[in-house]
Curated annotation (Swiss-Prot):
Transmembrane segments: none
Species for this entry: Yersinia pestis bv. Antiqua (strain Angola)
Domain of life: Bacteria
Gene field: deoC
Full protein name: Deoxyribose-phosphate aldolase
Role according to the record: Catalyzes a reversible aldol reaction between acetaldehyde and D-glyceraldehyde 3-phosphate to generate 2-deoxy-D-ribose 5-phosphate.
SMART domains given in the database record: DeoC
Pathway where it operates: Carbohydrate degradation; 2-deoxy-D-ribose 1-phosphate degradation; D-glyceraldehyde 3-phosphate and acetaldehyde from 2-deoxy-alpha-D-ribose 1-phosphate: step 2/2
């Protein structure tokens, strides 16, 4: 069976120097190829919502990005503000420093505060797997499952590494068959996307969506 890669893709542009013209082009590509969503920083949500109005492509905003180290109240506020501006999905970054400090209850409360402000809006929780042990990956996946989060997500694409097959498999095994798993960071071609899907990913975050659906080789850099 042929994989419909477009339906997996969150077409993504998160660079700090991304221009409005580049964001508009991103939206045009997403509509042309019928990608699942466009994922941007929250400041560009109003532009994306306007560009995607009337299309099937969803508006996704990152929150607390890329460090995840801000105040919980700020993350919760940003999520609510992004939703008010038109975001239909939210991707938040956990506080990795708290996790590595053993402040597990605080990490969980941080996620819960954002999830509560999301209400019915699907929340994806970014683990930054390249910085975590397998035990820590399982720990966060379990708390996300307990909090009824929609997705767990591998990476920001801004740290020391992106999605790895073994991490996606571990995340899928931990959360079970129903919850979403998003592979992001360094997924730049069809072969890598297929590897992640076979490992259990139900969404792919990438700036190389056009290359993936067309079977071409993307640039070596990018999300």
């Amino acid at each position: 069976m042929t994989t419909n890669y477009a339906h997996y893709i969150d077409h993504t542009l998160l660079a700090m120097d991304a221009t409005e013209a580049q964001i508009i082009k991103l939206c045009e590509e997403a509509k042309q190829h019928h990608f699942y969503a466009v994922c941007v920083n929250s400041g560009y949500v109003p532009v994306v919502a306007q560009q995607l109005a009337g299309s099937s492509v969803k508006v996704c905003s990152v929150i607390g990005f890329p460090l995840g180290a801000g105040l919980t109240a700020a993350k919760a506020f940003e999520a609510q503000a992004a939703i008010n501006a038109g975001a239909q999905e939210i991707d938040m970054v956990i506080n990795v420093g708290w996790l590595k400090s053993g402040k597990i209850a605080d990490v969980k409360a941080d996620i819960k505060a954002v999830r509560d402000n999301c209400a019915a809006t699907p929340l994806k929780v970014i683990l930054e797997t390249c910085l975590l042990s397998d035990e820590q990956i399982v720990q966060v996946c379990e708390m996300c499952r307990e909090l009824d989060v929609a997705f767990v997500k591998t990476s920001t694409g801004f740290s020391t590494g992106g999605a790895k097959e073994e991490h996606v498999k571990l995340m899928r095994a931990t959360v079970g068959p129903v919850m979403g798993v998003k592979a992001s960071g360094a997924v730049r071609d069809r072969a890598t996307a297929e590897t992640m899907i076979q490992a259990g990913a139900t969404r792919i975050g990438t700036s190389s969506g056009v290359a993936i659906v067309s079977g071409q080789q993307a640039a070596a850099s990018g999300y």
